From Swiss-Prot, chain A:
PANTHER family: ATPASES OF THE PP SUPERFAMILY-RELATED (PTHR11807), CYTOPLASMIC TRNA 2-THIOLATION PROTEIN 1 (PTHR11807:SF12). GO terms for cellular component: cytosol; cytosolic tRNA wobble base thiouridylase complex; mitochondrion. It is found in: Cytoplasm. This is Cytoplasmic tRNA 2-thiolation protein 1.
Amino acid sequence: MAPQTCAICQKAKAMVKRPKTGEQICRECFFYVFETEVHNTITQANLFKPGDRVAIGASGGKDSTVLAYVMKMLNERYQYGLELFLLSIDEGITGYRDDSLETVKRNQQQYDMPLKILSYDELYGWTMDAIVSQVGRKNNCTFCGVFRRQALDRGAAMLNVDHIVTGHNADDIAETVLMNIMRGDIARLGRCTSICTQGEDTIRRSKPFKYAYEKEIVMYAYFKKLDYFSTECIYSPDAYRGHARVFLKDLEAARPSAIIDIIHSGEAFEVREEVKATQRVQQVCQRCGYMSSNALCKACTLLEGLERGMANSGITDRARKKLDAEGPAPDNLRTIPFFKPPSGGPLIAIESVS
Amino acid sequence: MSCENPSVDKDALMARRPKFDKTKQCVKCKERTGNVVIRHAVYCKSCFFPLISTRFRKSLEPSVNPTPDGPRRKALKASGSLLVGLSGGLGSTVMLDLVAKTYFGAPSVADLGEEAPPSKPKGGKEHPRNMTGKDSEIWRGVPAVCYVEVCGAFPGAEDRTERVRQVVESYATTSPPFAFDFIPLRLEDAFDLEWWKGVGELLFTPPPSSTPILALQAYLSSLPTQTAIHSATQTLVRLLLLYTAASRRASHVLLGTSLTSLSVNLISGIAQGAGFSVAEEAMEEWRGEGKSGELTPPIRIVRPLRDVGMKECAIWAWWCGLRIVGRERYLGGTQGIGSLTRNFITGLERDYPATVSTIARTCAKLTPKEGSDGVCLLCQRPAQHGVQEWKSRTSIRSYNHASFSSSGHERPPHLANATDRPQHRTEPSPSSHLTPHLCYACHTTLTSRSSRGNVKQTSDSKVVPLPLWVGASLSLVPTSEDSSGEVWATRRMGDGEMKAAIGDLLLNDS
């Protein structure tokens, strides 16, 4: 059988079956359409302006490794004029983060980008290992998720950047759309397909890989020989998310466009005005100054529970009542430093390329 | 004395959560022992029937009057006739039963059950059921039950028309008898000129093709995935019902979608890119073109069982002794999005009974993000603009696409020196193209391919027949160059033209 020619350029020999479209295309065209689609995502949403300082949330996994590579390349190819940084969060999970942080440090060298690693220990006084030893394996993802989001914003504030880009891919977003519908989480459903989110006092966050399939990111890393660490978190994976992920993978196998079709669906609707009116207004945490839906932000609530030896108080209402019954938080309680949005120069020294 | 072993972990001895809350007594009357458990609540047989019929009426009655105001129960007056869609499945059979018993005097469950018939008319003499003469009519004329036989699409499938007819006619033998008009349709009617002449205006002459059944099979076999065959079938059934309803001057079409099926449809629709019309899945209003070409009065498609789960439907059918004919449930095999979603949702419903209701309630809070600028020719639901630009931006398939060259992109490195541009099949001009007139989901249905090899396609059919309403509407679509907004009145769609119109969608040429 004669080799297939690329469905896009009609010249070179087709090398891959593109996961997103099922088309058989050559390697060069694969690189080019992958990169151009990310570029389209960036330009369509007017994500950046020349001179922006942008931090790439880097975990050392496939998504952020490819993101760092592609961001650097697009920045040069299309002259975005961005100043790029790498920002990593060290959750303090022995054996999980150590190797991937090495990848990030190597990326720092390869891409010639300044790197900042911010640890949970440094920010909250607790590592995830210490948290798990107190709360057990159940519910520890709640702590990690809440702490990571705030840590990224705080790290970005320290770097004095305008913008954080994360490696969330199309599969992640499609899965979140489905999960939010099944959980009835209207507030998140309304914003989960936005390419860029920005709280009043926080730094802009965007997802340039919003339309990039996970399989294509892996394929890109493979052909470009980008090395990354693929380690599952050693603490329990979220069971409900697991269900949705398996379902999504089945849908993708049935019809590969399903992932992007779900994202299109998520972008096509919004929450009705009358429902929006009932949603809570954003406020500022009284204790740490970070954006919050309540008087205390979730991170401060969780941290107070940990510090007072009642870790579940941030998770169940019953434990919260028990904590409240014991009186107000003591004055000497360890708290998160007050959040200062970026202003002027970097607040901390960053590791520059040696 | 207890022989419990104190060293055993207490948690390990904990009984599983009972399937019902607290007591075995009915939560409603608090007297009788319960017979069924619905989402952890116990109901006795006597309380179960009013529970379901109340939910049924609550879902239906607010949309009966053209404007939902005034005391509803006294003044239920629809602007047209009623058409009930019956598939032979559980939901629609239960719905037909509820319609007959609630509005058309079929013996109520209380009469059928152990209890003696009430001395006073149930619901008071003002209740529509107990009124007589002209006053009793909520809908004009005789209500119709419409069944669409789909066996033509799936060789080897059983023709159930006669068995469904018996179900409908069984209401004529009850006391008091009530006869519905039974309208049996076939899926291939969508390609049958004779049927179309009865419901729509013939503005064009379709290509002299083979029989309707061959046209249907050619249409379905041209689709690229199992998923597409399932959703195309659903669309054909929906439009056949709607055009039939319009021809009978119906104001309401009732479908027996249960809460479970609604959740499946919502998730499956979203997974196929139909997020823009998510609100239409629960409740929609449609206006077609009548025989003389003008828009018909709006027809409301109501799903009165949208608050009743599949389990409650099954209990209703069992206690009322309903005969369920069954339906040809083609969900696209094990590899169709329809069947994957159905398995997923019914599995979730088993473990987390509230999930289906959460999905439906969440989707009821959604609305399309922007206004619609037209209607999809195929499914006739509102279509979003800019769909093709979105698709070409997020999934590049060609360097020749207008949006690619106009955005100032460089050529890919390996083509930078090439003098000739890649040769692609010539695209027909946009005005003659079907693509701009399709919604995202229908375009995806016609074009999105499977990763596991395509559905077997017929090699001899060069022209894919389309449902007749598509051809009729296409002939009325103004061209993009036609700035005066003039509309083509009559135009013959030849073979070549039809081919050009859908050239981009044909997959069997490759």
